[in-house]
């Protein structure tokens, strides 16, 4: 039953997904088809607008000719029939300056006005081209030269200005110009260069690197001290020192030799923490001291790292016997980091003396 139910659910889900996809494709095609249908209408509208604009431009261009003919033939009934349809665009597209030309024509007689127009004939020779076209036609087109003479008046003016521009000879000025840039060339006089800023980074300060080579010897120091505010008993202290293998010797201090019986080279020594740092074995039973100092000079006889381990064991033994603590060379609690630092110093000296 469960398997049949799963199959049914899978089939129903697949059908629903397919239906959604089909509906999506159908709606997208419908939208696209509507968009394509609207486009030809827009194109037809744009074409109609362009055609209307072109017709309007054509009518505007022909206004001059249409305006002139009806003015001359208005009094004559014979010619009014041929030019009557052209009068409509005259009143619609006549510009203001053309209306001013027509107003003096209406009150006066049309026949006499073309006779007065030759007074403007001296203006026509400037535009030689309109004269031959006006000759075959009657005097009705004489007001047209009012427009062409304006254009030739502007045309000859730029022609006169063009030859004037090349007249000033500029290449002659180019000769003194190279002389000026040559003068600032000596100005950069290598003044900033002698500042010698580059050698200023003092490279001799880097000899810090050879310092480990100079450390050919060092002293490892430990302290065994009483707790804060207390002191070590001299009698207990001397017994623990002797049991740790120290022997009283030179400089009135105790030394730890290679052999516990006091024979062989000295490995490390023990001194009093109080100045002058010496001991008197006869009076140590009555002595009280805040602590003692154990030190080892490196390099020493044998393996320095093994000697360091023996020194640390002796300090811990004495501290346990007298009830004190082991401190480092700065009289702080001994830590594993400090012990590694001591070992690194010993290795460094060994490498320098290798």
From Swiss-Prot:
UniProt main location, coarse: membrane
Keywords: Cell cycle, Cell division, Cell inner membrane, Cell membrane, Membrane, Transmembrane, Transmembrane helix
Transmembrane spans: 7-27
A GO BP entry: FtsZ-dependent cytokinesis
Cytoplasmic side: 28-354
Family annotation (HAMAP family): ZipA
SUPFAM superfamilies, alphabetized: Cell-division protein ZipA, C-terminal domain
Name used for this protein in its record: Cell division protein ZipA
Gene name tied to this protein: zipA
Extent of Acidic residues compositional bias: 49-60
Subunit and interaction comment: Interacts with FtsZ via their C-terminal domains.
